[in-house]
C-alpha cells in the first residue's frame, strides 16, 4: 500500500491481505504487527509508524521531513497460522510558506516601518506566531554605519531609524519567519529616505556712512516636520 500526504500531517495506508484459499480465511483475531513483532516503529529524522490490529498503518512524519519515507512491512496470518507480509510506503509532499517584500518611504530623519507579508504554503500548516521573526542572521537589530538602525518585532514589523544625514534608498534587511513545521520563509524590507533641504532668502540693509547696520537672512525649513534647529548658533 502507498499513501501521499502533506508535510507535517498524519497519513494512513492499509495493505491488502488475501487468503490463499477461501476455506482458510485471514485470522482477524490475531493482530497485525510489523516484521519484528512490534506495532510501533520510529525512524529518526523521518517519523513514527503505528500498525492497527486490522493492518492499517498510521504514519506521523517529523515536521521537517519531505519525500518518500522508508517502507515498513506489515505481517498478518491466516487461520492456519501461515504468515504473509506486505509493505506500506508513505510519501510526504513539501509545504513551503512564502514571503512578499515590502518598501516604505518618508522624509529625512523620520522613523519608518514596514511589514513583509508571509503566507502559509497550505492552510493546514499556518505560520507559527509563537516563534518571533528575526533577520536572516538570527538577530533582531541591525545597524548599518552611515545609514541607520533596523529592528524587527516578533510579528515581522521592521522599524528603521535613519541617521540624520542619510538620504536615498536604504540597504534593507531580510526578515525570516517559520510555519508550524519549522519551514522558513524570507522577505525583504527596503526603506527610502527623501532629502529635506532648507532654503534661505537673502537680506539687505541701508545705512548712513560710518553707522552700524544689521540684517537677518530668512531661513526656511525644507519640510514643516524638520524645523530649523535654533539650538545651533548661526555661523
Which stretches of residues belong to each language-model region?
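Extracellular interdomain linkers/hinges and stalk-like, low-complexity segments
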Residues: 1-28, 71, 79-129, 172, ...
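Polar/charged alpha-helical tracts
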Residues: 14, 33-36, 53-54, 115-117, ...
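A surface/secretory-pathway sequence property marking extracellular, secreted
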Residues: 27-41, 45, 127-147, 231-235
Amino acid at each position: 500500500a502507498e499513501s501521499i500526504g502533506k508535510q507535517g500531517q498524519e497519513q494512513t495506508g492499509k495493505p491488502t491481505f488475501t487468503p490463499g484459499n477461501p476455506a482458510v480465511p485471514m485470522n482477524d483475531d490475531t493482530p497485525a504487527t510489523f516484521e519484528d513483532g512490534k506495532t510501533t516503529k520510529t525512524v529518526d529524522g523521518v517519523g513514527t509508524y503505528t500498525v492497527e490490529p486490522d493492518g492499517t498503518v498510521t504514519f506521523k512524519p517529523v515536521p521537517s521531513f519531505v519525500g518518500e519515507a522508508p517502507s515498513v512491512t506489515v505481517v498478518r496470518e491466516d487461520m492456519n497460522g501461515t504468515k504473509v507480509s506486505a509493505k506500506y510506503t508513505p510519501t510526504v509532499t513539501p509545504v513551503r510558506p512564502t514571503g512578499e517584500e515590502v518598501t516604505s518611504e518618508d522624509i529625512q530623519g523620520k522613523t519608518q516601518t514596514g511589514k513583509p507579508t508571509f503566507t502559509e504554503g497550505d492552510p493546514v500548516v499556518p505560520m507559527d506566531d509563537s516563534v518571533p521573526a528575526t533577520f536572516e542572521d538570527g538577530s533582531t537589530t541591525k545597524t548599518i554605519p552611515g545609514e541607520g538602525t533596523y529592528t524587527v518585532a516578533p510579528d515581522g514589523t521592521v522599524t528603521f531609524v535613519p541617521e540624520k544625514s542619510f538620504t536615498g534608498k536604504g540597504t534593507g534587511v531580510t526578515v525570516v519567519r517559520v510555519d508550524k513545521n519549522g519551514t522558513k520563509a524570507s522577505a525583504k524590507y527596503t526603506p527610502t529616505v527623501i532629502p529635506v533641504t532648507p532654503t534661505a532668502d537673502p537680506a539687505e540693509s541701508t545705512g548712513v556712512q560710518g553707522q552700524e547696520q544689521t540684517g537677518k537672512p530668512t531661513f526656511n525649513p525644507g519640510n514643516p516636520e524638520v524645523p530649523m534647529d535654533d539650538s545651533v548658533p548661526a555661523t
